[in-house]
């Protein structure tokens, strides 16, 4: 007789505490020991592996190193950098962008003054204080914003070709503020040694708590599937078969890097994708249908047109293309 492990019927949501930035999720019943196992891996992935947007660097006019004082500004550069690290964004763009600001007169410079071009991003904590500019002074500043996962220290955050005076900033990309879990005993029938795992997730508002645990679960599943599909008697491939696999992989990778403008699309669809910063087929297939429909001027007619184009290449929306190292 095969022993069936006890599995949760579903993940419950504590509606009484649920907000746009906080979620409490309950998984029960679990076999003994699985509460800690699942809680630990979910916590680690939520904190370290979810993508987010952060300020990666700054250039301030008249400043050439990060330990400077700025004439006419109350805060020195280290204080301004610390404040900029705390700015949180909601962003649809996949690549880095830059915005320039000129703060003049007696002004309290806050995160809300950081304005995106063409709606590339939205500042969530607009009231966050950045600096105070004194009367008669001007603060000219360029802010570099990028996408990433987890945390990236400043020393690893200095791309080539940056202008003189560029100051790299420790980038806190993770959209998760805090994660904690607790494990309690729960009863199934006469047995009381099953477990209930309670997972608390707090986000910065750029992602809903529900979406964050769903994405974390997908990341975990994508890794576990290699173990689930593992066979101790792996097939032996000939050199020709290995070459065929490499060729197929490279062919798909090349296809995903193909520019959108190379597709036979209407002007309307092409303009919608350009405004959404969808530049390649890889950018397109990684999006879900409902995500595309949220873009300005993008309707079902455009969606149908794109579907027909993707079907020609045996592609579809919502594909996981991470193995092809799309950048």
Swiss-Prot record:
User: What is known about its subunit structure?
Assistant: Homodimer. The RNAP catalytic core consists of 2 alpha, 1 beta, 1 beta' and 1 omega subunit. When a sigma factor is associated with the core the holoenzyme is formed, which can initiate transcription.
Q: Which InterPro entries did the record assign?
A: DNA-dir_RNA_pol_insert, DNA-dir_RNA_pol_RpoA/D/Rpb3, DNA-dir_RpoA, RBP11-like, RNAP_asu_C, RNApol_insert_sf
Record-given protein name: DNA-directed RNA polymerase subunit alpha
Molecular function terms, GO-annotated: DNA binding; DNA-directed RNA polymerase activity; protein dimerization activity
The entry's family comment says: Belongs to the RNA polymerase alpha chain family.
Report which reactions are catalysed by this protein. RNA(n) + a ribonucleoside 5'-triphosphate = RNA(n+1) + diphosphate
UniProt function note: DNA-dependent RNA polymerase catalyzes the transcription of DNA into RNA using the four ribonucleoside triphosphates as substrates.
